[in-house]
Design a protein with these regions (language model features):
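Structural recognition of the beta-strand scaffold that forms the well-ordered cores
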Residues: 1, 12-13, 38-43, 71-73, ...
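Flexible loop/hinge segments that line or gate small-molecule binding clefts
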Residues: 1-20, 31, 38, 131-139, ...
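Structured segments of extracytoplasmic/periplasmic soluble domains
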Residues: 2-5, 28-32, 36, 61-65, ...
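Solvent-exposed loop/turn segments at secondary-structure junctions
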Residues: 3-6, 19, 45-49, 76-80, ...
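Short, solvent-exposed amphipathic alpha-helices that sit
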Residues: 21-25, 49-68, 82, 86, ...
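Hinge/cleft segment of the Venus flytrap/periplasmic-binding protein
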Residues: 42, 46-50, 61, 157-183
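Hydrophobic alpha-helical
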Residues: 58, 71-72, 76-137
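Extracellular/periplasmic ligand-binding modules, especially the Venus flytrap/periplasmic-binding
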Residues: 104-112, 150-167
C-alpha cells in the first residue's frame, strides 16, 4: 500500500508516518510561538486513517506545552472551501487565535484565505502534503509550514520493491518503509 496503514498480509507499505508527521508539525508550530498560544485544528474527514493519525500526533505534540490551548478542533474534510468557511466561523468566536494546524494543505489554504480576509495575517498556518500551492504559500510567507508527504517517492519505492520481488522473490526487510520528510 502507498500511504495507508498496511493490513497484516500486506507485502509492503511506503509513505509517511502520519502520527509522527502530526507530532512534528505541532512541535514546530508550538516552538515557533514560544510554547504558548491558542490553536485551531482543522481535521480531515471522519474515519480517514491518515487524518486520524495526524490529528492524534498533533494533539500529543501540543499537549506537551502547558501554555498551548486548543480552542477548537473541527473537520474541514480536506477541502479548501471548507477550510475557509470553518476558519471564518471559528475566528469570529476566537478572535485571538495564534495558529491553525490543518490536517492537509487544501484546508490550510482555505484557512489562509479566511485569515487574510479578516486581516489576521500574523496567525501561523500549517498544513500537510507539500502541495505546490502550499509550498508557494510558505515561500510567500502566508503559511508557516507544510509537511511534504512525497507521494511520488512513495510510489517509486513501492514499484521498485514490487519489481524486485517479481524478478527474484526478494521481500523487503520490514512491512513499512517510512519517508523521512520534514516540516
Amino acid at each position: 500500500t502507498i500511504g495507508t496503514p498496511a493490513a497484516e498480509d500486506t507485502f509492503l507499505r511506503t509513505g509517511v508516518d502520519y502520527y509522527e508527521s502530526g507530532y512534528t508539525m505541532a512541535k514546530a508550530a508550538a516552538d515557533k510561538l514560544g510554547g504558548k498560544g491558542k490553536f485551531i485544528i482543522l481535521e480531515g474527514p471522519a474515519g480517514a486513517s491518515n487524518a486520524i493519525e495526524r490529528l492524534n500526533g498533533i494533539n500529543t505534540g501540543l499537549s506537551e506545552y502547558e501554555g498551548i490551548e486548543i480552542v477548537a478542533s473541527q473537520t474541514a474534510n480536506f477541502k479548501r472551501t471548507e477550510g475557509m468557511s470553518v476558519t471564518e466561523n471559528l475566528i469570529q468566536q476566537y478572535t485571538d487565535v495564534d495558529a491553525v494546524i490543518a490536517c492537509n494543505d487544501e484546508s490550510a489554504l482555505g484557512a489562509v484565505q479566511a485569515l487574510t480576509a479578516a486581516n489576521m495575517n500574523d496567525v501561523l498556518v500549517c498544513g500537510f502534503d507539500g502541495s505546490v500551492d502550499a509550498t508557494n504559500a510558505v515561500k510567500e510567507g502566508t503559511m508557516f509550514a507544510t509537511y511534504n508527504t512525497d507521494p511520488y517517492g512513495s510510489g517509486f519505492v513501492a514499484c521498485a520493491y514490487a519489481v524486485k520481488y517479481l524478478n527474484d522473490k526478494t521481500e523487503p526487510e520490514g512491512k513499512f518503509i517510512p519517508f523521512p520528510t520534514a516540516a
